[in-house]
């Protein structure tokens, strides 16, 4: 059987992984096998952390809305219940932004919903 010279293809594949792992510590950035394993772990962690970030932002928005709504003597859960009952489905992100940045606008909306 004749010898197959892989040429630049294998080198390009390894370099791509090494470039991805260039900021990793120790052998994880130097040795190909360790870098390959670390890249897989990094991508898995990145996926999980994107999901956790969504969860954390939702909790933050709810906390901000709750703090703003309690000023009017209503809890967050009652506020959301009244909001859906009045068929005004604003998402939590916009409500939290209104509560922090546009307080007069949020107060008119909350008074209409609660009343």
From Swiss-Prot:
Gene Ontology cellular component list: chloroplast; ribonucleoprotein complex; ribosome
Keywords: Chloroplast, Plastid, Ribonucleoprotein, Ribosomal protein, RNA-binding, rRNA-binding
UniProt-listed SUPFAM superfamilies: Ribosomal protein L20 (SSF74731)
Compartment(s) of residence: Plastid, Chloroplast
Annotated Pfam families: Ribosomal_L20
UniProt keyword Ribosomal protein present: yes
GO terms, molecular function: rRNA binding; structural constituent of ribosome
GO BP term (any one): translation
Function: Binds directly to 23S ribosomal RNA and is necessary for the in vitro assembly process of the 50S ribosomal subunit. It is not involved in the protein synthesizing functions of that subunit.
Record family assignment: Belongs to the bacterial ribosomal protein bL20 family.
Descriptive protein name: Large ribosomal subunit protein bL20c
Gene coding for it: rpl20
């Amino acid at each position: 059987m004749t010898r197959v010279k892989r040429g630049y293809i294998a080198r390009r594949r390894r370099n791509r992984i090494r470039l991805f792992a260039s900021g990793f510590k120790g052998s994880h950035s130097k040795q190909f096998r360790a870098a390959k394993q670390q890249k897989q772990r990094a991508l898995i962690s990145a996926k999980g952390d994107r999901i956790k970030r969504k969860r954390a932002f939702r909790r933050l928005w709810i906390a901000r809305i709750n703090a703003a709504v309690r000023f009017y003597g209503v809890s967050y859960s009652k506020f959301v219940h009244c909001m859906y009952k009045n068929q005004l489905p604003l998402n939590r992100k916009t409500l939290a932004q209104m509560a922090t940045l546009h307080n007069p606008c949020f107060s008119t909306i909350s008074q209409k919903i609660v009343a």
